[in-house]
């Protein structure tokens, strides 16, 4: 009896932990960690990602980068400062204008 309860708790814990943070596209992270109804709820660094019945805020820049300029000319290169890239909506739906993203320390990796 105790073994089946432990197994059930373990499986439930793995299921819940795998679901956490899965609201955003694979290369973006949830920030701020709130539910949203519109893009305005998320601030200028994030957009509202609909995911089933729950919409969450996801960053416009990929994981490991920061936004350095709020606009750029996607898909043409340029328009961003050195060592930064122009990033668009990760699934191509045009939910936000392309932004310039850069690694905080471009010379270290």
Curated annotation (Swiss-Prot):
Gene Ontology CC: extracellular region
Keyword Secreted: yes
Segment forming the signal sequence: 1-21
Tissue: Prismatic layer of shell (at protein level). Expressed primarily in the mantle with highest level in the mantle edge and lower level in the mantle pallium.
Broad class of where this protein is predominantly found: secreted
Protein name as annotated: Uncharacterized shell protein 3
PROSITE patterns: TNFR_NGFR_1
Record keywords: Secreted, Signal
Record localization: Secreted
Native source organism of the sequence: Margaritifera margaritifera (Freshwater pearl mussel)
InterPro entries, alphabetized: TNFR/NGFR_Cys_rich_reg
Domain of life from the UniProt record: Eukaryota
